[in-house]
Design a protein with these regions (language model features):
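A short, proline-enriched helix->beta-strand linker immediately N-terminal to the Walker B motif
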Residues: 29-33
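Charged, flexible cofactor/metal-binding loops and thiol motifs
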Residues: 97-186
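Conserved ABC ATPase "signature" region
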Residues: 1-5, 114-115
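Conserved ABC ATPase signature
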Residues: 10-14, 18
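Interfacial catalytic loop of ABC nucleotide-binding domains
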Residues: 5-10, 96, 129
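ABC-type ATPase nucleotide-binding domains, specifically the catalytic core motifs of the NBD
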Residues: 1, 13, 96, 142
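P-loop NTP-binding/switch modules centered on Walker-like glycine-rich loops
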Residues: 36-40, 44-126
């Protein structure tokens, strides 16, 4: 609680949550209109994660600043964001209102990210969908300029069409777009 003592402390003398708060305070010192939070809760326990998100939400309301949240944590996205832009290998693959994208993901990578999130059930006896992972590995940097779908090697729906050209974004109702020739409801 003693801010003056914390300002003189070394990072190794602080917890992960304290270091994160110092970084947020440093970023906000110049009153930015946009705050870019890149994986702001990585390696923090869930209680501290919730505190950081509460802090960011409070700061957003008080300052009016926009927050760009860069994360793989779809739970964080659901809590913090109004819109989501899902990227894969440096390319936008899906975009839209958060509730809509999480409820009806159109791109296979987005579906994979959402399937990785554990589902909470009321009773331990209730069936829970098994956790899944997105198979394969991210392409090497040499593939990033390729005129094809970079997710195709990891995609269960991939066809020859995916390797033929980079998919153009397709529009869906409600302002949702997905760059996939097989884009559709989950």
């Amino acid at each position: 609680p003693n801010a003056r003592a914390r300002a003189a402390a070394y990072p190794f003398q602080m917890s992960g949550g304290q270091r994160q708060r110092v970084m947020i305070a440093t970023a906000l010192a110049c009153a930015p209109k946009i705050l870019i939070a890149d994986e702001p809760t990585t390696a923090l326990d869930v209680t501290v994660q919730a505190q950081i998100f509460d802090l960011l939400n409070d700061l957003r309301r008080q300052s009016g600043a926009a927050i760009i949240l860069i994360t793989h944590d779809m739970g964080a996205v659901a809590e913090m964001a109004e819109r989501i832009l899902v990227m894969y290998a440096g390319r936008k693959v899906e975009e839209g209102p958060v509730d809509q994208v999480i409820e009806t993901p159109r791109h296979p990578y987005t579906r994979g990210l959402i399937a990785c999130v554990p589902h909470i059930v009321a009773e331990m006896s209730e069936d829970r969908p098994p956790l899944t992972e997105v198979p394969g590995i991210v392409p090497g940097l040499d593939a990033f300029g390729a005129d094809r779908c970079l997710f195709a090697p990891r995609c269960g729906s991939a066809t020859a069409e995916c390797a033929a050209a980079r998919p153009a974004p397709r529009a869906f109702p409600g302002g949702q777009t997905a760059a996939c020739v097989h884009a559709g409801p989950a």
